[in-house]
Amino acid sequence: MYLAREMDLAILPSRRLVKFKAFTKRSLSMDEIELASLSSRAFLFNFLPLLLLLAFLDIFASSNASFLAAVLIKILVKSVFSALGSSLKSFTSGSRASDCLAALEFFDIFLAMLCFRRYLTSIVKEKTTFCRLCSHIQYF
């Protein structure tokens, strides 16, 4: 049991704990750290594939789809990103410490997703081949 808690603590980088302390002005107990680690990992496994799919759809819409399909995909992408942003606000307004820490974890994932989307868009705009795109992603 103690080893599992140490592993959960190791999964959460100290940078996020510093952010959390600055955000709430208090320290965390081991149970709160463990709960936040589990909830952020569950969020990652549930929503990251959807975000990746939406990023590829958004790139497809901006590069070679018809106008109507491009508009529909853009609306879908923007609505999902705004829904995720509002869920971040509800996480942050929660009273439990684990919810706040999970919101910070989600915000880091969200920022990484936006950077990944910009990176893929820049590659597609260069009109590279699919093999070159795969080699870029391999070294990303």
Curated annotation (Swiss-Prot):
Its Gene Ontology cellular component terms are: membrane
Membrane topology summary: Multi-pass membrane protein
Compartment annotation: Membrane
Q: Does the keyword Membrane apply?
A: yes
User: Which residue spans traverse the membrane?
Assistant: 42-62, 65-85, 96-116
Q: Which UniProt keywords apply?
A: Membrane, Transmembrane, Transmembrane helix
Remarks, anything else?
Partially overlaps ECM1.
Q: What is this protein called?
A: Putative uncharacterized membrane protein YAL059C-A
Source organism (scientific name): Saccharomyces cerevisiae (strain ATCC 204508 / S288c)
